[in-house]
């Protein structure tokens, strides 16, 4: 929902206080995303959406276009928060280069995407970094060395103990952590075609699971970090199945400073924030 200025403007017009700009990558030819069905859904006994699966990658829009739009959005909405999600190879120079470009936009902060479980982890990014606390610490330290922007580390739930990665973020000097990213999953199997679903070009794949069904997992992991002595005091951004103000309040009750919402916005629209504002007031 926050992949371009058009959608970010809609979010701010609806009343959202800030956005997480869809993950940017390195300069050069844009990444080629999946062409075809990128999503799968899990419904309960009625049409209510319980879980949502995606195998989408990071932005497939040119870096220069994204950066120019971020500059304009900050000019148009100086009182709103714009944090830019980033994912580049686990190389110091790659991070140094992207940090300089993002800092020039006037963005309020960066979120290090160490959680994506599909497509990018096979390239040594995303969850491949987030599952190794030493890598989390190393990249967070690079970001604090080369940028003055507030640095948030987004954590993967696809790990035995999420506290180990959170501790790495703290040691690296991160200003905050966010969790959870999506959970590695296979949405189902098309028994007629004997392929995982969703499938594109006769090929299926695992993807990232989110939506209301993951909220209990997210709450547990958040509470683990909030109660950890080595992570004491670090701000936490809660993610995972937040659909209404009660969900948001539950995350905050367990230690979140704020919450992020994606799936519910995709399914119900930006104006769901109105109920959240009323309820939390």
How should these model regions be labeled?
Residues 8-14, 18, 75, 89-237, ...:
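Alpha/beta enzyme core
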Residues 2-3, 94, 161, 243, ...:
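Short, glycine/acidic-rich beta->alpha junctions
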Residues 1-83, 87-92, 276:
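N-terminal capping/small domains of soluble enzymes
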């Amino acid at each position: 929902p926050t992949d371009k200025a058009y959608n970010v403007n809609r979010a701010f017009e609806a009343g959202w206080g800030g956005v997480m700009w869809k993950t940017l990558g390195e300069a050069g030819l844009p990444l080629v995303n999946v062409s075809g069905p990128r999503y799968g859904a899990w419904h309960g006994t009625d049409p209510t959406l319980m879980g949502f699966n995606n195998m989408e990658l990071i932005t497939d829009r040119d870096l220069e276009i994204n950066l120019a739009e971020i500059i304009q959005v900050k000019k148009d909405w100086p009182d709103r928060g714009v944090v830019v999600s980033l994912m580049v190879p686990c190389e110091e120079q790659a991070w140094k280069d992207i940090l300089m470009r993002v800092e020039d936009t006037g963005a309020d902060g960066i979120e290090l995407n160490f959680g994506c479980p599909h497509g990018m982890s096979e390239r040594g990014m995303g969850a491949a970094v987030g599952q190794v606390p030493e890598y989390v610490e190393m990249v967070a330290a690079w970001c604090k060395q080369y940028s003055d922007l507030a640095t948030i580390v987004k954590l993967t739930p696809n790990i035995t103990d999420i506290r180990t990665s959170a501790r790495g973020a703290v040691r690296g000097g991160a200003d905050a952590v966010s969790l959870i990213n999506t959970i590695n999953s296979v949405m189902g199997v098309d028994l007629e075609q004997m392929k995982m679903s969703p499938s594109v070009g006769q090929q299926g794949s695992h993807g990232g699971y989110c939506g209301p069904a993951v909220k209990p997992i997210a709450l547990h992991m958040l509470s683990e970090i909030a109660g950890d002595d080595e992570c004491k005091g670090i701000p936490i951004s809660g993610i995972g199945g937040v659909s209404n103000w009660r969900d948001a309040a539950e995350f905050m009750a367990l230690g979140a400073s704020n919450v992020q919402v994606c799936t519910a916005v995709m399914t119900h629209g930006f104006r769901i924030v109105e109920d959240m504002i009323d309820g939390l007031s």
